[in-house]
Amino acid sequence: SNIPDGEAHVMPDGKVYIYGSLDTKEDSWCSNQYKVISSADLEHWVESEISFSIKDVPWADEIQEPTYLEGVKSYNELPEAILTFLPEETREMPIDQFLPLLRNILIEQQKNKSLFAPDCIYKDGKYYLYFCLSDDTEGVAVSDSPTGPFKNAVKLPVKGIDPAVFVDDDGQAYYY
């Protein structure tokens, strides 16, 4: 498997575990599931079964209205992420005609959400997998094992991609 965007952690059993996106197709990145790879010696690696799936995300079927399009009066006001992928010839269409088309595309894309790069920590006897979806929602799921399965996903009150977490020497956990 191809697991890009990896976050490596030494867990209490002394093994290194890598958590990352899971590319399952050659023509696209990310997918709707995660696997974990681990090693006791950094030479021999073991790939887990599916550790987490988008099917375990209660809000995965929700459609987020692209509210950031409200009030846009010109192409220059669109988010940079959209402008990057927007063909130059598209800008010839009047913005008031283009925005409804863009909204429909953005809504349609949400029907095929992906899981982006996760991270995982061990704290108080449990493993916490912090994950994000392609719609910028984020969550956390828990397991008794560093390779999952991670369950009981809870939505976090933040938006973004590729969360990172760590536990400091004093036991305080940080999420960023």
Which residue stretches match the model-derived regions?
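Carbohydrate-active catalytic/glycan-binding domains of CAZyme proteins
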Residues: 1-176
